[in-house]
């Protein structure tokens, strides 16, 4: 199996998880800065936003994870900030998205940027970053699904790493990574089509696409908190889908400008 630690520098462990997150972030920032001028947004605003939003999102993702694992962390408070022993592995993407959205609201108000324009730029970048970041779960041997008889359709390096606790496991990380990659490609193609998508609909596409995929894939997992018959992440996914649909209906009704004239 793959060692979750990529580099050991004395007492400091640099995990593949962190490398995947940073790689996804760098690519996301590059793509967003390249697209920003098309929406009359200064590329430096993208960088300034990331410098604030990224650490806040990490904290939000960590707090979200801790909140739903409080039975453990309530008895081991020091583990909440125990990043030097792999604490960064315990984060949840929805917590990061919520924290990032809060930062986005205040950032756009301060810089006098239309939040919808910023979201349209950010959506494909977030999607590709998530696609790459999921491979960190693979290296950590986490976020996997239920036991299956075999995974013969997968390459051996994935199959071997999905043999956990005496059984092969559904590689849900891979399903979500591929799903996000497909969504990213679709957004890049569709946003170049003239008079197809209206302002805000790229962000709406992300919410619907990611929400739908996450809701299905989350049902394959065995390590998620349940609430009222569904996993918490599935409820949040449903919210994303309905918000995305609502944005499209609203933007079409008010005849918002096209993203690409």
Swiss-Prot record:
<protein>
    <recommendedName>
        <fullName>Phosphatidylglycerol--prolipoprotein diacylglyceryl transferase</fullName>
        <ecNumber>2.5.1.145</ecNumber>
    </recommendedName>
</protein>
<feature type="transmembrane region" description="Helical">
    <location>
        <begin position="170"/>
        <end position="190"/>
    </location>
</feature>
<comment type="function">
    <text>Catalyzes the transfer of the diacylglyceryl group from phosphatidylglycerol to the sulfhydryl group of the N-terminal cysteine of a prolipoprotein, the first step in the formation of mature lipoproteins.</text>
</comment>
<dbReference type="GO" id="GO:0008961">
    <property type="term" value="F:phosphatidylglycerol-prolipoprotein diacylglyceryl transferase activity"/>
</dbReference>
<comment type="similarity">
    <text>Belongs to the Lgt family.</text>
</comment>
<keyword id="KW-1133">Transmembrane helix</keyword>
<feature type="transmembrane region" description="Helical">
    <location>
        <begin position="229"/>
        <end position="249"/>
    </location>
</feature>
<keyword id="KW-0472">Membrane</keyword>
<feature type="binding site">
    <location>
        <position position="134"/>
    </location>
    <ligand>
        <name>a 1,2-diacyl-sn-glycero-3-phospho-(1'-sn-glycerol)</name>
    </ligand>
</feature>
<dbReference type="GO" id="GO:0042158">
    <property type="term" value="P:lipoprotein biosynthetic process"/>
</dbReference>
<feature type="transmembrane region" description="Helical">
    <location>
        <begin position="41"/>
        <end position="61"/>
    </location>
</feature>
<keyword id="KW-0808">Transferase</keyword>
<dbReference type="Pfam" id="PF01790">
    <property type="entry name" value="LGT"/>
</dbReference>
<keyword id="KW-1003">Cell membrane</keyword>
<feature type="transmembrane region" description="Helical">
    <location>
        <begin position="12"/>
        <end position="32"/>
    </location>
</feature>
<feature type="transmembrane region" description="Helical">
    <location>
        <begin position="200"/>
        <end position="220"/>
    </location>
</feature>
<feature type="transmembrane region" description="Helical">
    <location>
        <begin position="87"/>
        <end position="107"/>
    </location>
</feature>
<comment type="pathway">
    <text>Protein modification; lipoprotein biosynthesis (diacylglyceryl transfer).</text>
</comment>
<keyword id="KW-0812">Transmembrane</keyword>
<feature type="transmembrane region" description="Helical">
    <location>
        <begin position="112"/>
        <end position="132"/>
    </location>
</feature>
<dbReference type="GO" id="GO:0005886">
    <property type="term" value="C:plasma membrane"/>
</dbReference>
<dbReference type="InterPro" id="IPR001640">
    <property type="entry name" value="Lgt"/>
</dbReference>
């Amino acid at each position: 199996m793959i060692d979750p630690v990529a580099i050991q520098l004395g007492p400091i462990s640099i995990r593949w998880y962190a490398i995947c997150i940073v790689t996804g972030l760098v690519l996301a920032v590059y793509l967003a800065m390249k697209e920003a001028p098309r929406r009359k947004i200064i590329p430096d605003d993208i960088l300034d936003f990331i410098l604030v939003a990224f650490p806040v999102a990490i904290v939000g993702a960590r707090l979200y994870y801790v909140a739903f694992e409080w039975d453990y962390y309530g008895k081991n408070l020091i583990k909440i900030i125990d990043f030097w022993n792999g604490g960064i592995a315990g984060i949840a993407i929805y917590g990061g998205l919520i924290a990032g959205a809060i930062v986005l609201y205040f950032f756009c108000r301060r810089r006098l940027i239309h939040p919808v324009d910023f979201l349209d730029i950010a959506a494909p970048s977030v999607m590709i970053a998530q696609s790459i970041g999921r491979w960190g779960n693979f290296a950590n041997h986490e976020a996997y699904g239920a036991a299956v008889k075999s995974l013969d359709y997968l390459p051996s390096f994935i199959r071997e790493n999905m043999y956990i606790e005496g059984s092969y496991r559904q590689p849900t990380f891979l399903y979500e990574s591929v799903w996000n990659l497909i969504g990213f490609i679709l957004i890049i193609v569709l946003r170049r089509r003239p008079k197809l998508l209206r302002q805000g609909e790229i962000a709406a596409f992300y919410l619907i696409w990611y929400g739908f995929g996450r809701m299905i894939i989350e049902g394959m997992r065995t390590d998620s908190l349940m609430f009222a018959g569904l996993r918490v992440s599935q409820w949040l996914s449903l919210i994303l889908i309905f918000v995305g649909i609502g944005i499209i209906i609203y933007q079409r009704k008010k005849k918002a400008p096209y993203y690409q004239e």
